[in-house]
């Protein structure tokens, strides 16, 4: 979220991976607050997607997590079958593009959120396993925008069952994690919540 810009992404694709209208809206904050919004649209398709007829929740081309760095947008996909994430890159400019595949990371879970503090060169991903166990995945000490070239650390969170969905930070040390409501009566009745996480000692 660069200063002065807000990004809203329509990139979820978790049924059959067959959406053809994937896009991100970039809005100038000042224009929005002034009542005359200036909105740029960045639409895309995946450069390596050939199959648009996957069974429900088996696609490798779902995505909920992305970060913005200078002139590029980096997306971390939610690969339902493999429990991995692939990194794709888009220009941070209006237009239609092919999202370029960069690399794959075995997160052993479904990635749902990302936050990046550029000054600290640290990305924190959040997600959950197929058994509902939430986790964080830290990427740090990397070179340039080769996010997987540095250190990596997976942190299991102390929650019994939680569908983690979003993460944010101001200082790269203290984080806010949100979870989705999950109701499966009579077994589950988990409300939407926000959790504070202190990663100072990590």
What do the predicted segments below correspond to?
Residues 1-202:
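Sequence/structural signature of beta-propeller domains
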């Amino acid at each position: 979220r660069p200063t002065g810009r807000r990004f809203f992404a329509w990139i979820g694709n978790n049924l059959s991976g067959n959406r053809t209208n994937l896009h991100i809206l970039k809005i100038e904050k000042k224009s929005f607050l002034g009542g005359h919004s200036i909105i740029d649209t960045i639409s895309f398709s995946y450069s390596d997607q050939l199959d648009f007829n996957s069974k429900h929740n088996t696609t490798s081309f779902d995505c909920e997590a992305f970060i913005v760095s200078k002139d590029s947008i980096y997306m971390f996909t939610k690969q339902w079958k493999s429990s991995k994430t692939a990194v794709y890159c888009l220009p941070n400019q209006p237009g239609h593009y092919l999202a370029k595949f960069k690399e794959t990371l075995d997160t052993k879970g479904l990635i749902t959120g990302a936050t990046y503090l550029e000054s600290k060169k640290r990305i924190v991903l959040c997600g959950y396993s197929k058994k509902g166990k939430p986790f964080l995945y830290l990427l740090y000490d990397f070179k340039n925008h080769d996010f997987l070239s540095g250190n990596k650390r997976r942190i299991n969170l102390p929650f019994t069952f939680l569908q983690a969905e979003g993460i944010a930070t101001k200082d790269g040390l203290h984080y806010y994690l949100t979870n989705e409501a999950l109701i499966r009566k009579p077994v589950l009745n988990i409300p939407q919540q926000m959790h504070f996480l202190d990663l100072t000692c990590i």
